[in-house]
C-alpha cells in the first residue's frame, strides 16, 4: 500500500464521504440511504446497495438520474453463524455504490474505480488483483490496455463467481471484482483468491448488459447499466491496516465499551471471548437501525430477526459475565458513532434505547426461569444433566447449550451433549413430518412453523360466524396441546370467519366459543394464507382438535368495512381532484380511522382537500351499490381495475367495484352500499417522506363523533366569548387586534423601563485607550429590549465603542441573555461580535452567534454571569489597549 498522506481518507466517515464526493464530481446524484424495510415485497430486508434501484433496473420506475451514487445500509442474516468468527462477516454493513442507468458502461466504470482506489484511497497497484468473467474480453482489454494492469493480476473466473443475475430470468451480466492482496511479496504465481488470509474482495463492478429469458437465452438490453458495490467496513480494514473489520473505527468503539463494562481486555482475551465481543459489536449496529426504521421485536418476519439478534447479544453477554442489563449502554455508543450520517438515529434515540431495554429485560426473565430449573437439577445430586433436560432448557426457556455446559462445569457435573443432539434431531424430524406439534426454539422462528399448517379457509365475507376446528395452539412462543383459563394464546383454525390483518386492514376482534370455552380474540394476522388468532382464554380449557364456533364482533367489522370502502373512494377522489397518477403507497384501515399514503410532489391545498371531501360525500349520498367478484387478473386490469404497485397478486383476483366511481383489486371487507358510510371527513394531511403524502380520515360513527366534538367546542367558545356561532370569527379577529395593540403598549413600556435602566450607562463608560467600553448587568429586560439598549448605547458612543450587556429576564425561568455590539472602527480592525459572544456564553453553559458588529446569545447557568462579564472585561481591555498602542 502507498504511504498514507494527510489527504488520504482513513476514518470510516472519511472513506464514505470521499466515495460519494468522487462520484458526485463525476455527475452522479447522491441518493440518501433507503430504509432497511424495502418497498420490494419479495425480500424481507434491504440486503444490497442496488435493491432500492431494482425497479429502475427492471424498467418499472423512472430513474432518479442517469447516474447515481449512495451509501446504503444493509442487513443480511444468512451467514449469522460466521459473524464474529471470520474477519469480514457482518449482519449490518454499509454498501458504497455507483450506478449508471443507460449512460456510461464498462470503460468508465473500470477507469473511475481504478482512479478512486489508487488516487483517492491511495492503494498501490501491487496490492490489487482483479477478477473478470472468463468470456468478458472487453473488460480484460480495458484492464490491460487502458489501466495497465499486469496480465497475471487479471484472474478469469466462471459464471458462478463473475456473472451476476437478479434471478433465473431478467437483467444480468458479467462482473469484475477488485481484491486487495495483504501479502504481495508472495508474487502473482498460482493465485488463489479463496485464500481469505491473503485476499479480500472489496469492490464489485457489475455490467448489466443482457436479459435472460425463461429458456436461458441471453439478449442485449436496450440500455446497458452499471451496478457497483464497495463494502465500507472492508475498505476501512484495508486503509486502517487492521486484522479484521471489527477493529476498525466503525465497530471497535462498541467493542471497547463492552470490554469496559465486562472488565475484559479485548487484545489479551482468548478467541472465544473475542468472538462474543465481536458478535455484540456487530449485532448492536443492526439492532439500532432496525428499530429506528420501525421494526418491532416479535416472533414473525423482521420482528423475529430483531428479537434473535438481541437474544444472541444477551447470550454472549452472559458468556462475558454480564448478568445485568447492558445493551442500551452499547446502543448509545453505536448511535453516537453513526448519528451524523443517519440523523434518524439521534431523533429516535429514546425509542431505540427503550425498545432494547424492554426486550433484554423480557428475555432475561426467561433465562432466570431456566436457571431455576438448572439449579434444581444441580442440587439434586446428579452427576450428569440428561440430554432431555438440556434440550428442555434450550427449547422451552431459550437456554443456550453453551450456557448450560458452562454452569454445569462450574458445579463439577456434566451434560449429555449426544443426548441433546439426539433430541434436536428428533425435533427436526417432527418438523419435517409436519404431523406432530413442535416447540419454537430461541433460534427458531414462527415464520417457519407456519409452513406446518394447511391453508386456513376464510369464509367471513358473507357470514360473521363459522364452525371450526383447533389446529394449533401457541403459548409463549411454544406449540402446545392445551391452554387454560387466563393464558394468552395464538390459535390456528382450519377455517374462520375472522378477517386476518392484510392489505392495510386490521384483523377482526371477537370470540371463539365452545360448550365451556370462551376465547376473546383481540387480533388476527394472516401469514402465508394461515390465519393466526391472538387472544386470551377467558373460560374453560382450549385443546387441539376441539370443535369451536368463531364469532366476529359485528360493530367492529362494520367500522373497518366502512373505512375500507372510504379508502377506495378517497383514492378515486384524489385521482379526480389532484392527479390521475396518484397511487397508493401504503394504508391503514382501522376500526376508528383510515390512513392513506400516496405519491405527490407537493402538499395538497386546502381547496383540494375540500373538493376531495365534497366528492367522496357526494358518492356516499348517491348510495352506490358495490359489486364484488373474482376474475382473472388480466381481465380485471383490462377493465381498468387499480392495483397497488409492487404488490403480488394471484392469477385470480378479487375485484371491488363501485360503478363509475372506483374499481380496485382488494381482498378486504366492504359495505354493501356507499350510504352505509354516513359521511366522510379528512382530519389531517402531511408529508411523510420525499414525494409521499399521508391523509388521515374518518367515516361513519367516528366522523359523526368528530363533528359532535367540534360542535361542543364551538358551543364552549361561544360561551367564553359571549357570541353566537356566526359571530365567532369577528369576535376572535377583534380580540387579536386588541391583543396586538396591548402587546405594542407593553413593548413600549418595556422600552421605557429599559431606557431608564441603561440611559445613565453612556456617561459612565470606561475609557480604554482610544475606545469606550461598557460591560454591565441589566436584569428584567427581554431580548428585544436588551438589543435596543446595546444598539442605542453604541450609537451614542460612536465608532470606537464596545457594549456588552448580560442579564436575567425572569429569575423564575433562570435563563440568561447576552448581547454584544461593536462600533464600526472595531469591526474594521477584525473584531467579531459573534465569536466573542460564543466565548462569553459558554462560561454560562450557553451559546449563540451573530454578525461582526452585533450578536446575541442565551445561557442556563445564571450563577456564572459575573464570571462571564469579568472574562469579557479582561479580554477586551487587553485587545483595546493593543489597538490603542498601534
From Swiss-Prot:
Example of a GO biological process term: alanyl-tRNA aminoacylation
Record-listed E.C. numbers: 6.1.1.7
UniProt key word Transmembrane helix: no
InterPro entries xref list: aa-tRNA-synth_II/BPL/LPL (IPR045864), Ala-tRNA-lgiase_IIc (IPR002318), Ala-tRNA-ligase_IIc_anticod-bd (IPR018162), Ala-tRNA-synth_IIc_core (IPR018165), Ala-tRNA-synth_IIc_N (IPR018164), Ala-tRNA_ligase (IPR050058), Ala_tRNA_ligase_euk/bac (IPR023033), DHHA1_dom (IPR003156)
Family label: Belongs to the class-II aminoacyl-tRNA synthetase family.
The protein, known as: Alanine--tRNA ligase
Cofactor(s) needed: Zn(2+)
Entry-linked Gene3D superfamilies: 2.40.30.130, 3.10.310.40, 3.30.54.20, 6.10.250.550, Bira Bifunctional Protein, Domain 2 (3.30.930.10), Threonyl-trna Synthetase, Chain A, domain 2 (3.30.980.10)
Annotated compartments: Cytoplasm
Primary subcellular site in the record, as a coarse category: cytoplasm
Pfam family, one: DHHA1
Binding-site positions, Zn(2+): 564, 568, 666, 670
PANTHER family: ALANINE--TRNA LIGASE, CYTOPLASMIC, ALANYL-TRNA SYNTHETASE
Domain note: Consists of three domains; the N-terminal catalytic domain, the editing domain and the C-terminal C-Ala domain. The editing domain removes incorrectly charged amino acids, while the C-Ala domain, along with tRNA(Ala), serves as a bridge to cooperatively bring together the editing and aminoacylation centers thus stimulating deacylation of misacylated tRNAs.
Keywords, alphabetical: Aminoacyl-tRNA synthetase, ATP-binding, Cytoplasm, Ligase, Metal-binding, Nucleotide-binding, Protein biosynthesis, RNA-binding, tRNA-binding, Zinc
Domain of life where this protein originates: Bacteria
Gene name as annotated: alaS
Entry function: Catalyzes the attachment of alanine to tRNA(Ala) in a two-step reaction: alanine is first activated by ATP to form Ala-AMP and then transferred to the acceptor end of tRNA(Ala). Also edits incorrectly charged Ser-tRNA(Ala) and Gly-tRNA(Ala) via its editing domain.
Reactions it catalyzes: tRNA(Ala) + L-alanine + ATP = L-alanyl-tRNA(Ala) + AMP + diphosphate
GO MF: alanine-tRNA ligase activity; aminoacyl-tRNA deacylase activity; ATP binding; tRNA binding; zinc ion binding
Amino acid at each position: 500500500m502507498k504511504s498514507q498522506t494527510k489527504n488520504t481518507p482513513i476514518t470510516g466517515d472519511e472513506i464514505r464521504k470521499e466515495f460519494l464526493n468522487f462520484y458526485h464530481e463525476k455527475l452522479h446524484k447522491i441518493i440518501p440511504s433507503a430504509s432497511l424495510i424495502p418497498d420490494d415485497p419479495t425480500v424481507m430486508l434491504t440486503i444490497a446497495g442496488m435493491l432500492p434501484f431494482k425497479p429502475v433496473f427492471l424498467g418499472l420506475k423512472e430513474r432518479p438520474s442517469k447516474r447515481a451514487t449512495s451509501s446504503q445500509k444493509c442487513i443480511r442474516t444468512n451467514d449469522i453463524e460466521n459473524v464474529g468468527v471470520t474477519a469480514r462477516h457482518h449482519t449490518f454493513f454499509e454498501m458504497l455504490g455507483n450506478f449508471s442507468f443507460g449512460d456510461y458502461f464498462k470503460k468508465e466504470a473500470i477507469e473511475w474505480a481504478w482512479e478512486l482506489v489508487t488516487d483517492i484511497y491511495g492503494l498501490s497497484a501491487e496490492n490489487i488483483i482483479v477478477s473478470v468473467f472468463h468470456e468478458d474480453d472487453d473488460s480484460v482489454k480495458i484492464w490491460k490496455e487502458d489501466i495497465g494492469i499486469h496480465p497475471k493480476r487479471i484472474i478469469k473466473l466462471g459464471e458462478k463467481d463473475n456473472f451476476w443475475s437478479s434471478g433465473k430470468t431478467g437483467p444480468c451480466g458479467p462482473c469484475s471484482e477488485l481484491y486487495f492482496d495483504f501479502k504481495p511479496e508472495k508474487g502473482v504465481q498460482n493465485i488463489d483468491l479463496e485464500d481469505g488470509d491473503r485476499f479480500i474482495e472489496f469492490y464489485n463492478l457489475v455490467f448489466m448488459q443482457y436479459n435472460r429469458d425463461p429458456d436461458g437465452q441471453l439478449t442485449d438490453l436496450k440500455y446497458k447499466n452499471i451496478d457497483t458495490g464497495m463494502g465500507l467496513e472492508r475498505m476501512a480494514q484495508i486503509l486502517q491496516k487492521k486484522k479484521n473489520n471489527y477493529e476498525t473505527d466503525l465497530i471497535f468503539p462498541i467493542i471497547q465499551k463492552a470490554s469496559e463494562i465486562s472488565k475484559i481486555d479485548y487484545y489479551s482475551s482468548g478467541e472465544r471471548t473475542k468472538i462474543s465481543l465481536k458478535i455484540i459489536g456487530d449485532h448492536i449496529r443492526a439492532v439500532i437501525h432496525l428499530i429506528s426504521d420501525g421494526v418491532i421485536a416479535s416472533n414473525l418476519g423482521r420482528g423475529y430477526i430483531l428479537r434473535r439478534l438481541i437474544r444472541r447479544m444477551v447470550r454472549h453477554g452472559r458468556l462475558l459475565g454480564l448478568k445485568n442489563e447492558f445493551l442500551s449502554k452499547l446502543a448509545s455508543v453505536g448511535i453516537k458513532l453513526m448519528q451524523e450520517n443517519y440523523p434518524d438515529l439521534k431523533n429516535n434515540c429514546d425509542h431505540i434505547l427503550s425498545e432494547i431495554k424492554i426486550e433484554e429485560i423480557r428475555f432475561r426473565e426467561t433465562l432466570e426461569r431456566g436457571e431455576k430449573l438448572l439449579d434444581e437439577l444441580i442440587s439434586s445430586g446428579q452427576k450428569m444433566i440428561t440430554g432431555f433436560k438440556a434440550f428442555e432448557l434450550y427449547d422451552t426457556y431459550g437456554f443456550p447449550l453453551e450456557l448450560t455446559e458452562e454452569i454445569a462445569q462450574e458445579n463439577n457435573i456434566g451434560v449429555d451433549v449426544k443426548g441433546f443432539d439426539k433430541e434436536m434431531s428428533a425435533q427436526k424430524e417432527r418438523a419435517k413430518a409436519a404431523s406432530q406439534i413442535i416447540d419454537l426454539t430461541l433460534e427458531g422462528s414462527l415464520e417457519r412453523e407456519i409452513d406446518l399448517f394447511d391453508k386456513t379457509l376464510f369464509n367471513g365475507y358473507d357470514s360473521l360466524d363459522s364452525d371450526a376446528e383447533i389446529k394449533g395452539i401457541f403459548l409463549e412462543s411454544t406449540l402446545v396441546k392445551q391452554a387454560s383459563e387466563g393464558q394468552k394464546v395464538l390459535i390456528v383454525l382450519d377455517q374462520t370467519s375472522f378477517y386476518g390483518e392484510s392489505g392495510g386492514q386490521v384483523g377482526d376482534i371477537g370470540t371463539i366459543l365452545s360448550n365451556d370455552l370462551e376465547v376473546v380474540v383481540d387480533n388476527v394476522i394472516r401469514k402465508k394464507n394461515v390465519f393466526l388468532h391472538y387472544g386470551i382464554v377467558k373460560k374453560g380449557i382450549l385443546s387441539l382438535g376441539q370443535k369451536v364456533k368463531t364469532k366476529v364482533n359485528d360493530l367492529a367489522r362494520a367500522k373497518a368495512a366502512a373505512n375500507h370502502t372510504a379508502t377506495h373512494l378517497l383514492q378515486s377522489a384524489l385521482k379526480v381532484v389532484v392527479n390521475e397518477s396518484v397511487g397508493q403507497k401504503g394504508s391503514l384501515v382501522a376500526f376508528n380511522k383510515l390512513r392513506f399514503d400516496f405519491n405527490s410532489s407537493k402538499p395538497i391545498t386546502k381547496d383540494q382537500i375540500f373538493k376531495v371531501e365534497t366528492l367522496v360525500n357526494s358518492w356516499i349520498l348517491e348510495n352506490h351499490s358495490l359489486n364484488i367478484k373474482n376474475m382473472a387478473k388480466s381481465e380485471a386490469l383490462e377493465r381498468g381495475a387499480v392495483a397497488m404497485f409492487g404488490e403480488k397478486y394471484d392469477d385470480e383476483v378479487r375485484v371491488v367495484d363501485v360503478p363509475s366511481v372506483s374499481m380496485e383489486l382488494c381482498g378486504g371487507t366492504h359495505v354493501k352500499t356507499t350510504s352505509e358510510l354516513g359521511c366522510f371527513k379528512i382530519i389531517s394531511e402531511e408529508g411523510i417522506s420525499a414525494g409521499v403524502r399521508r391523509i388521515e380520515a374518518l367515516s361513519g360513527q367516528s366522523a359523526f363523533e368528530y363533528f359532535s366534538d367540534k360542535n361542543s367546542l364551538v358551543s364552549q367558545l361561544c360561551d367564553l366569548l359571549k357570541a353566537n356561532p356566526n359571530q365567532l370569527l369577528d369576535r376572535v379577529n377583534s380580540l387579536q387586534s386588541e391583543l396586538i395593540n396591548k402587546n405594542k403598549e407593553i413593548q413600549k413600556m418595556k422600552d421605557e423601563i429599559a431606557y431608564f435602566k441603561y440611559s445613565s450607562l453612556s456617561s459612565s463608560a470606561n475609557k480604554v485607550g482610544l475606545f469606550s467600553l461598557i460591560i454591565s448587568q441589566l436584569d428584567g429586560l427581554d431580548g428585544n429590549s436588551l438589543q435596543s439598549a446595546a444598539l442605542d448605547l453604541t450609537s451614542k458612543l460612536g465608532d470606537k465603542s464596545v457594549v456588552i450587556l448580560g442579564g436575567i429576564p425572569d429569575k423564575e425561568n433562570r435563563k440568561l441573555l447576552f448581547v454584544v455590539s461593536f462600533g464600526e472602527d472595531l469591526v474594521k480592525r477584525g473584531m467579531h461580535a459573534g465569536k466573542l459572544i460564543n466565548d462569553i456564553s459558554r462560561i454560562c453553559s450557553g451559546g449563540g452567534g451573530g454578525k461582526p458588529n452585533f450578536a446575541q446569545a442565551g445561557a442556563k447557568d445564571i450563577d456564572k454571569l459575573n464570571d462571564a462579564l469579568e472574562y469579557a472585561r479582561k479580554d477586551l481591555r487587553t485587545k483595546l489597549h493593543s489597538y490603542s498602542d498601534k
